[in-house]
Amino acid sequence: MKLVFLAPLLLSINLLNAQDNYEIQVYGAPTQAKNSTIFELHSNFTFDGEKNIVENVRPTHHATHETLEITTGITDNFEIGVYLFTNITPGYGFEIVGTHIRPRISAPESWKLPVGLSFSAELGLQKSVYSTDNWSLELRPIIDKQWDKLYVALNPTFSVSLVSDFNSKVPVFQPNVKVAYSFFKKVNLGIEYYGATGYVNESQPINNQAHAIYFAYDMMGSNDWELNFGVGLGLTEATDKLVGKVILGRKINWKKTK
């Protein structure tokens, strides 16, 4: 009887682990420039996370996640990104977790919208010992706006489990928000929020939802390099309590500008 009572809670904890701490990023609306590629390494370490195996998914406590993301601009407003996810967990060693592909399109500048607007669809597979979703689809509208030194980005994301032994195919709402301010010429300091509130057709108790706040730094002013790092605090029982993240990117132009 006790296991039956706990099953919905354990399912919620696994289901609502926002972004699974592999790719912790709030996207801006602009797509990668045509004829250029950015190589990004996402390095995340969970200082205080889940210590038990839950529904076949291995613990996140003291896990190191290294994700390679390669994004190429195809046209002036269309890009394709690919991901390779890896995991190093004490007691389990190094393993490749899975791979994703993510096409994204942005609104043309000719539309003269008051905000930046784009949309991505991310499809991928991952091993069942690292995720309750074997195949998943993420639909991500992206809205952003720059006011002088203040920057705001919204990613009201919907994640769909395509193949899973545990999760429904009903979309899960995962809102992400970034608010940053340019305190110095080449430095943005801000707050990033990552959440997962549950299936769109039913409400979850707050402790079964995932909510995390990251205090983040962004390097500005470089056309060739990208740097973001931050420390995240989990706000509910369903969220890893303390996570550090670093995103390091290098941009390459394949066609020389005249």
What annotation goes with each model-predicted range?
Residues 18-258:
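Transmembrane beta-barrel domains of Gram-negative outer membranes and organellar outer membranes
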Residues 1-22:
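Bacterial Sec-dependent N-terminal signal peptides
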